[in-house]
Amino acid sequence: MDVRRLKVNELREELQRRGLDTRGLKAELAERLLAALEAEEPEDERELEADDDPGLPGHNNEEVETEGGSELEGTAQPPPPGLQPHPEPGGYSGPDGHYVMDNITRQNQFYETPVIKQENESSYDRRPLDMEPQQQVYHPELKTEMKQEAPPSFLPPEASQLKTDRPQFQNRKRPFEENRGRGYFEHREDRRGRSPQPPAEEDEDDFDDTLVAIDTYNCDLHFKVARDRSSGYPLTIEGFAYLWSGARASYGVRRGRVCFEMKINEEISVKHLPSTEPDPHVVRIGWSLDSCSTQLGEEPFSYGYGGTGKKSTNSRFENYGDKFAENDVIGCFADFECGNDVELSFTKNGKWMGIAFRIQKEALGGQALYPHVLVKNCAVEFNFGQRAEPYCSVLPGFTFIQHLPLSERIRGTIGPKSKAECEILMMVGLPAAGKTTWAIKHAASNPSKKYNILGTNAIMDKMRVMGLRRQRNYAGRWDVLIQQATQCLNRLIQIAARKKRNYILDQTNVYGSAQRRKMRPFEGFQRKAIVICPTDEDLKDRTVKRTDEEGKDVPDHAVLEMKANFTLPDVGDFLDEVLFIELQREEADKLVRQYNEEGRKAGPPPEKRFDSRGGGFRGRGGGGGFQRYDNRGPPGGNRGGFQNRGGGGGSGGGGGNYRGGFNRSGGGGYNQNRWGNNNRDNNNSNNRGNYNRAPQQQPPPQQPPPPQPPPQQPPPPPSYSPARNPPGASSYNKNSNIPGSSANTSTPTVSSYTPPQPSYSQPPYNQGGYTQGYTAPPPPPPPPPAYNYGSYGPYNPAPYTPPPPPTAQTYPQPSYNQYQQYAQQWSQYYQNQSQWPPYYGNYDYGGYSGSTQGGTSTQ
């Protein structure tokens, strides 16, 4: 698929199919789609390799996100056997010497080059380029899409018009609204009716649990762990580049003199971050308790040494040691044999930085300290003692944690064995109802379950700078940052459905469709809904308090829409239990019904996905057009589409009561005679007229008209109507007696108006095949002269045909003022029709008194 040749609509369709964001300019959409395609490519490549040689080891499918194309956090795939170390700069040799890493850099190349590199690969090994025959990978789905593309040399007429019109829409900017916070973007995501794909089962790795390694259960969802469990890196695509990502080791210690090493293998390129982002590449290394979060150094009993040359604990940062960056090796030492204290110190490339922390053993309470790392856009590797030689010299008297007897190591919390043991709690409630407060308290009161809170607030906690939350005085666009955090959350939810953990989904979740959509991927979990529904007075007080603390988070119109659509969950196919925390079910039902009524009264009418005013979209089909305006004609008719490529049912001649469109095919179209068979003011068809690109029929040679017998009664004079006439109303019928045209001969049910005498006469003329004639009231005029308009051929009048005998009905004549009023309204109507200036702008509509439509044609 050549993404650069896709149109904007096609790009959006491809992104929507993958669950990606469809907003942005064409260049951004193409960049996003290319990144998704590159992320999908390794999975297809591995599947083909497995089919070619099923005997190769290590072909377990890597976890790949079901939507969005980004790779899910998990363990990485080892390289095929026989791949030798490749000692190029920026890579590293693994502990067994089989492979080196490089494609961490490649996962973000799409931000700096037009050709998108692989965003997230199964592992960050360095593979020689000649061993990656990506051009041989077969993509049947992509090939099908390429067949549907038009050849680059061919552009239909409408395509060029659309291309010229498109930039004016791309340059429009949405007005900035300061009160678009995290709740607003959660609300927008909940309104989207996506159907999630069922998650694939997580691969079960046969890993020796007695080894000290990175714990895949005690790490962030967006931290990717290699299959050897000694290295990892974070996701960095889009908003993930703002996030810290942490991981802890599987074993800790509480006695002895223990150490481990950490090497920064690469600073991953994140050129999509703004230049104002402070410290886009940082690593913090140290120790923490098993009960601490992954945010190293930002809470008690969490001790870290950062690459900015600072140490931190409980979010208190102090200068310490030297700064460190890519390719530096940091040694971490814990000395439990210093009397009543525990001393933590660090080395940089073998140079001792001094004692960083002294902790009282009583404060620890006999709890073990675990190796811990927190990274931001960096790939790291640990040496717990599995390497034959350390990276750098180790302080005398210290032992690598891997070399300690198993009895002296303390295993961290072990995760659930199956999904049936896992639990997901879905919070349900309006903004500021207290969902986040309840979730934090519940997680703290159940530390053994290690709840992962999935919410925008938790995402923002991982975007801290120097331990401080980003506030609205953030240098960039706050609403853009919040929107990126919401997108990160959506991907984390997809990742979470494949991991055996306990979760709390901290969002509003008031839409019934959102509740169902978010719970279905967690099939097999214990799925529970936690409804926070305070009284209306409490909700108002909490909203005011939250606004004072954080600013206005959700616009009022979004809150009203949530109220109008608030649905209390029920136990059913996607929920095993529903718990009400404040108001119970009966009281909550009454309050929710009140909210529904309040929201429906205050909000706009419900949106319609499709317009019911016509068939098809904008007249592209044969059964009618998607109407740009309301129906203003008689019943059964539509105002017409702008672009009709179909036949009679659209804006062409075959459709009844249409305003008339621009028809590019032969099944209808603008007729040569404007006031002909589909007269605009005809009560039966009410079509304004059609234009046909077909060659004009030449009129017959000029013949003298036969003598006209005097009519028994005057024919119906022209009556005038400025707009669409309802059935039975009077109409202005400009009867034409040109051969080949059909004048309106229907008799209105209400008598029309006859202009006062003396009458006027407009001779018929030919203007480039656009013919119109007027027949004056009796007595009949002499044969009209022929006019020649420049290069247009002379008019050859056809034989005059006398009009049919009129009916015996008489028509009262209106006053001159009424006629002038109708003419003025007719002129005003055509002044508003700026969409068809080539056809109507220079047309002479009679030049009669009171008309402002224009004089004679200047063509």
Swiss-Prot record:
Residues 36-131, 146-206, 595-814 are annotated as: Disordered. Sequence repeats lie at residues 613-615, 620-622, 639-641, 645-647, 659-661. Residues 728-744 have a biased composition (Polar residues). Residues 671-696, 745-775 have a biased composition (Low complexity). Residues 118-130, 174-193, 595-612 have a biased composition (Basic and acidic residues). There is a cross-link at residues 117, 143 (Glycyl lysine isopeptide (Lys-Gly) (interchain with G-Cter in SUMO1)). One of its GO terms (cellular component) is synapse. Residues 214-859 are annotated as: Necessary for interaction with TP53. Residues 613-661 are annotated as: 5 X 3 AA repeats of R-G-G. InterPro entries: B30.2/SPRY (IPR001870), B30.2/SPRY_sf (IPR043136), ConA-like_dom_sf (IPR013320), P-loop_NTPase (IPR027417), SAP_dom (IPR003034), SAP_dom_sf (IPR036361), SPRY_dom (IPR003877), SPRY_hnRNP_U (IPR035778). The modification Omega-N-methylarginine is found at residues 645, 659, 664, 674. Residues 613-661 are annotated as: Necessary for transcription repression. Residues 192-389 form the B30.2/SPRY domain. Residues 457-595 are annotated as: Necessary for interaction with BRD7 and transcriptional activation. Residues 77-88, 697-720, 776-786, 796-807 have a biased composition (Pro residues). SUPFAM superfamilies: Concanavalin A-like lectins/glucanases (SSF49899), P-loop containing nucleoside triphosphate hydrolases (SSF52540), SAP domain (SSF68906). GO terms for molecular function: enzyme binding; RNA binding. Acts as a basic transcriptional regulator. Represses basic transcription driven by several virus and cellular promoters. When associated with BRD7, activates transcription of glucocorticoid-responsive promoter in the absence of ligand-stimulation. Also plays a role in mRNA processing and transport. Binds avidly to poly(G) and poly(C) RNA homopolymers in vitro. The RGG-box domain is methylated. Interacts with BRD7, PRMT2, TP53 and NXF1. Associates with histones and BRD7. This is Heterogeneous nuclear ribonucleoprotein U-like protein 1. The lineage of its organism: Eukaryota, Metazoa, Chordata, Craniata, Vertebrata.
